[in-house]
Swiss-Prot record:
Reactions catalysed: [GlcNAc-(1->4)-Mur2Ac(oyl-L-Ala-gamma-D-Glu-L-Lys-D-Ala-D-Ala)](n)-di-trans,octa-cis-undecaprenyl diphosphate + beta-D-GlcNAc-(1->4)-Mur2Ac(oyl-L-Ala-gamma-D-Glu-L-Lys-D-Ala-D-Ala)-di-trans,octa-cis-undecaprenyl diphosphate = [GlcNAc-(1->4)-Mur2Ac(oyl-L-Ala-gamma-D-Glu-L-Lys-D-Ala-D-Ala)](n+1)-di-trans,octa-cis-undecaprenyl diphosphate + di-trans,octa-cis-undecaprenyl diphosphate + H(+)
Topology of the protein relative to the lipid bilayer: Single-pass membrane protein
Name of the protein described by the UniProt record: Biosynthetic peptidoglycan transglycosylase
Pathway(s) where this gene product acts: Cell wall biogenesis; peptidoglycan biosynthesis
Family: Belongs to the glycosyltransferase 51 family.
Encoding gene (name): mtgA
Keyword presence, Transmembrane helix: yes
GO biological process annotation, one example: cell wall organization
One Pfam family named in its UniProt record: Transgly
Keywords: Cell inner membrane, Cell membrane, Cell shape, Cell wall biogenesis/degradation, Glycosyltransferase, Membrane, Peptidoglycan synthesis, Transferase, Transmembrane, Transmembrane helix
Function: Peptidoglycan polymerase that catalyzes glycan chain elongation from lipid-linked precursors.
Compartmental location: Cell inner membrane
MF term (GO), any: pentosyltransferase activity
Species annotation: Rhodospirillum rubrum (strain ATCC 11170 / ATH 1.1.1 / DSM 467 / LMG 4362 / NCIMB 8255 / S1)
Length: 230
């Protein structure tokens, strides 16, 4: 009986430890990276282990052209400044489209993508989705929108071995992130869903057409007084 009690006690301790790691670790990371630059993400580490290079240069949000900020919001998350991490309107629309026979699509916000890129592995299983939702709630509670956008634009993948706006601008267009034109910004925003297959610097017909659409929408994005929703 004592042996069984001991095993049960150790089992509970292990479960408690896992609970703390899964739920407490994101909180610690978010507190640190609320002010500190992000040195690497799980995806960057994975790509390095696969033998891929790493081009990345952290820059503050004010060193990223407003055109790129507008383009990314217009393309990836039009209600970024209004929602609290989850765009319920977009989720309802995606579900309605699915019920009409369309393929079920994601309604991932910039907040969700930032949480995923910062702390999680790639994949579509329910465990990762659940952790992503939890991390997104924490992210929105602890970070202002400006910080979410700043981190996203510095860690997102923009091509094989290319991470962040500064590296992407220099790789694809030979300019700094601050010097991007509206057209270049729109092209960079459009390739985000598939950056390893689509090229902002050598756009195909679809990317070019989509970029023109996004460029037309950019003027409607209000960045606020602080340059990111504030």
């Amino acid at each position: 009986m004592r042996t069984m009690d001991g095993r049960w006690r150790w089992g509970r301790l292990v479960l408690l430890g896992l609970f703390i790691v899964f739920l407490g670790w994101p909180l610690s990371l978010l507190m640190v990276f609320r002010v500190a630059p992000v040195p690497a993400t799980p995806l960057m580490v994975l790509r390095l282990l696969e033998g891929e290079g790493l081009a990345k240069d952290w820059v503050p949000l004010e060193a990223i052209a407003p055109a790129l900020r507008r383009a990314v919001i217009a393309s990836e998350d039009g209600r970024f400044c209004q929602h609290g991490g989850f765009d319920t309107k977009e989720l309802e629309k995606a579900w309605s489209d699915y019920q009409r026979g369309d393929r079920l699509r994601g309604a991932s916000t910039l907040s969700m993508q930032t949480a995923k890129n910062l702390m999680l592995w790639d994949g579509r299983n329910w465990l990762r989705k659940g952790l992503e939702a939890y991390d997104t709630v924490l992210l929105e509670a602890l970070w202002p929108k400006r910080r979410i956008l700043e981190v996203y634009l510095n860690i997102v993948e923009w091509g094989p071995g290319i991470y962040g706006a500064e590296a992407a601008a220099r790789h694809h267009f030979g300019v700094s992130a601050a010097a991007l034109s509206p057209r270049q910004a729109a092209l960079l925003a459009v390739v985000l869903p598939n950056p390893r297959e689509w090229s902002a610097g050598r756009p195909g017909a679809y990317v070019s057409r989509r970029a023109a659409t996004i460029q037309a929408r950019m003027g409607a994005v209000d960045l606020g007084k602080d340059g990111a929703c504030g």
